[in-house]
C-alpha cells in the first residue's frame, strides 16, 4: 500500500501537463504559422493546394523550416486532415555571462536566474559574445521554447540610460 502512495508522489511532481501541441485542420494553416513535421516544430514558409482529384481530397503541400535546426522539411497532407501545431513560447532574458558554453540568463520580470541554455553555435553565438564583451548595454536574448526544447534564436542591445 505504501508503494502506491510513492507512485502518486512521483506523478504529482511531474510537469504541469500542458499540451505541447494542439490539432488544426490542414486547410486552416497559413504561411508563417507553426506546424509539426516529422516530429519537429517548424515554421511554414511555402504552401500550395492541389485540386480535388478523382481519388480523394485536395492536398496541401507545405515547405517549412525547423525552428531549432533551420533544416527544410516538407509534408503533403489531405486538406481535411488535422495536423499538430506546436505551442511556441518566446521570452526575453538578460544575458549575464557565458561560462563553459552555457549562458547565465536573468528573467527581467522575476529576476530568476536560468543557466541551462547553451550558447548558439556559429555567427549568432559569436555576435552575442562580442556584444556582451563590448558592454554597450544589456544584451537581451530571445529564447524560443517548443515541444520540450529551448534555444536562443536572437538578441538585441538595450542601451544604458
Curated annotation (Swiss-Prot):
One Gene Ontology term, aspect cellular component: cytoplasm
PROSITE patterns referenced in this protein's UniProt entry, alphabetically: IF5A_HYPUSINE
UniProt keyword annotation of Protein biosynthesis present: yes
Q: Which UniProt keywords apply?
A: Cytoplasm, Elongation factor, Hypusine, Protein biosynthesis, RNA-binding
Q: PTMs?
A: Lys-54 undergoes hypusination, a unique post-translational modification that consists in the addition of a butylamino group from spermidine to lysine side chain, leading to the formation of the unusual amino acid hypusine. eIF-5As are the only known proteins to undergo this modification, which is essential for their function.
> What InterPro entries would the database entry show?
IF5A-like (IPR001884), IF5A-like_N (IPR048670), NA-bd_OB-fold (IPR012340), Rib_uL2_dom2 (IPR014722), Trans_elong_IF5A_hypusine_site (IPR019769), Transl_elong_IF5A_C (IPR020189), Translation_prot_SH3-like_sf (IPR008991)
Q: Coiled-coil stretches, from where to where?
A: none
Any one Gene Ontology MF annotation carried by this entry is: translation elongation factor activity
- Give residue numbers for the modification (Hypusine): 54
For the biological process aspect of GO, one term held by this record is: translational elongation
Localization terms from the record: Cytoplasm
Name the tissues where it is expressed: Expressed specifically in the germline in the distal region of gonads where germ cells actively proliferate.
Q: What is the stated purpose of this protein?
A: Translation factor that promotes translation elongation and termination, particularly upon ribosome stalling at specific amino acid sequence contexts. Binds between the exit (E) and peptidyl (P) site of the ribosome and promotes rescue of stalled ribosome: specifically required for efficient translation of polyproline-containing peptides as well as other motifs that stall the ribosome. Acts as a ribosome quality control (RQC) cofactor by joining the RQC complex to facilitate peptidyl transfer during CAT tailing step.
Q: Return the NCBIfam families for the record.
A: eIF_5A
Q: Which PANTHER family does UniProt cross-reference here?
A: TRANSLATION INITIATION FACTOR 5A FAMILY MEMBER (PTHR11673)
- Family label: Belongs to the eIF-5A family.
The identity of this protein, by name, is Eukaryotic translation initiation factor 5A-1
Task: Give the originating organism.
Answer: Caenorhabditis elegans
Amino acid at each position: 500500500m505504501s508503494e502506491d502512495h510513492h507512485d502518486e508522489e512521483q506523478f504529482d511532481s511531474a510537469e504541469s501537463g500542458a499540451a505541447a501541441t494542439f490539432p488544426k485542420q490542414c486547410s486552416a494553416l497559413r504561411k508563417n504559422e507553426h506546424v509539426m513535421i516529422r516530429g519537429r516544430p517548424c515554421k511554414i514558409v511555402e504552401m500550395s493546394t492541389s485540386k480535388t482529384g478523382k481519388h480523394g481530397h485536395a492536398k496541401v503541400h507545405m515547405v517549412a523550416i525547423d525552428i531549432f535546426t533551420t533544416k527544410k522539411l516538407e509534408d503533403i497532407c489531405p486538406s481535411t486532415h488535422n495536423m499538430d501545431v506546436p505551442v511556441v513560447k518566446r521570452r526575453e532574458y538578460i544575458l549575464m555571462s557565458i561560462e563553459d558554453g552555457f549562458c547565465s540568463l536573468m528573467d527581467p520580470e522575476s529576476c530568476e536566474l536560468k543557466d541551462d541554455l547553451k550558447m548558439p553555435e556559429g555567427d549568432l553565438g559569436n555576435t552575442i559574445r562580442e556584444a556582451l564583451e563590448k558592454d554597450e548595454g544589456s544584451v537581451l536574448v530571445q529564447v524560443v521554447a517548443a515541444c520540450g526544447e529551448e534555444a536562443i534564436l536572437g538578441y538585441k542591445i538595450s542601451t544604458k540610460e
